[in-house]
Amino acid sequence: MSSQSSILVDFRPLATSFTGKYGSIQYCVRAVLERPQVPDQSVRRELQVVSHVDVNTPPLLTPMLKTQEKMVGCWLFTSGPVSLSVKIERKGYCNGEAIPIYAEIENCSSRLVVPKAAIFQTQTYLASGKTKTVRHMVANVRGNHIGSGSTDTWNGKMLKIPPVTPSILDCCIIRVYIHIPGAKKLMLELPLVIGTIPYSGFGRRNSSMASQFSMDMCWLALALPEQPEAPPNYADVVSEEEFSRHIPPYPQPSACDGEACYSMFACIQEFRFQPPPLYSESHAQLFCLQPVGPTNRAHF
């Protein structure tokens, strides 16, 4: 015998399922079959809950930047300062993404230093008024040695995020530090959120598409015909002497109706060798051809 039933789940924000060294976050469904005079029977099934973290929200798109300087040595035995400036493009990333790190390191001390960057995951357990914190490294990258009086620049040095649990209350950080032999490390920490909804780059893609569209439309301006220029004046091109020299003799017609024929011939002679009219956009006229005779019109 089998039956189906449903329950109403409260979809308020829930923390992502997690299992750690000193505690865990688990969700389960437990069903109990109660019968009179018979022991109850129960079954339990675990539910995997993932609280989605969208890295496209404005707080997680904010760039992170920090700068710090440390004097190497103490008292009268100082050897000079070491400065570090670090920036990442945004605060939120997802599993599998590579974080480009931009850093400037200046070594004004007399010692050899080595810059490093790492991702640390921090787990904090609270129970019975006591707190237990566990921090472990999940990824790291190392730079080149920097000698005394030298500088080094990271122009997007990649630090790839391995498969880790999505952040619960911003529990991850990026730690960039400089190992200085014989002295304490110069360390910077930038907050990092591991999300579940990857970065879409919507705004940047729109701007690139708009620039590409404007570039693609450049050919249209080249293909459009230029504004036509007015033709030159006929008198400037053909002189009066050349004009009279090229007029062929026209004999008088033998058979003509008299005045009508003469007037028509005079009209032809009058306009045959006249220069074309000057072109002017302000006096341009549109000519329409109209049908002669009755037309049929349909009404709908």
From Swiss-Prot:
Q: Where in the cell is it found?
A: Early endosome; Cell membrane; Cytoplasmic vesicle
Tell me its family: Belongs to the arrestin family.
Query: What is the annotated role of this protein in its UniProt record?
Result: Functions as an adapter recruiting ubiquitin-protein ligases to their specific substrates. Plays a role in endocytosis of activated G protein-coupled receptors (GPCRs) Through an ubiquitination-dependent mechanism also plays a role in the incorporation of SLC11A2 into extracellular vesicles. May play a role in glucose uptake. Participates in innate immune response by promoting IFIH1/MDA5 activation through interaction with TRIM65.
Q: What is this protein called?
A: Arrestin domain-containing protein 4
Gene Ontology molecular-function annotations:
ubiquitin-like ligase-substrate adaptor activity
Q: Does the keyword Membrane apply?
A: yes
Q: SMART domains given for it?
A: Arrestin_C
Q: Which PANTHER family would you find in this protein's record?
A: ARRESTIN DOMAIN CONTAINING PROTEIN, ARRESTIN DOMAIN-CONTAINING PROTEIN 4
Q: Where is this motif: PPxY motif 2?
A: 276-279
Q: What keywords would UniProt list here? A: Cell membrane, Cytoplasmic vesicle, Endosome, Membrane, Repeat
Recite the lineage of the species: Eukaryota, Metazoa, Chordata, Craniata, Vertebrata
Origin organism is Rattus norvegicus
Q: Which domain of life is it from?
A: Eukaryota
A GO CC annotation given for this chain: endosome
The record places the motif (PPxY motif 1) at: 231-234
Query: Which example biological process does GO assign this protein?
Result: protein transport
Instruction: Write down the membrane topology.
Output: Peripheral membrane protein
The annotated subunit structure for this chain is: Interacts with ADRB2. Interacts (via PPxY motifs) with ITCH, NEDD4L and WWP2. Interacts with AVPR2. Identified in a complex containing at least ARRDC4, AVPR2 and HGS. Interacts with SLC11A2; controls the incorporation of SLC11A2 into extracellular vesicles through an ubiquitination-dependent mechanism. Interacts with TRIM65.
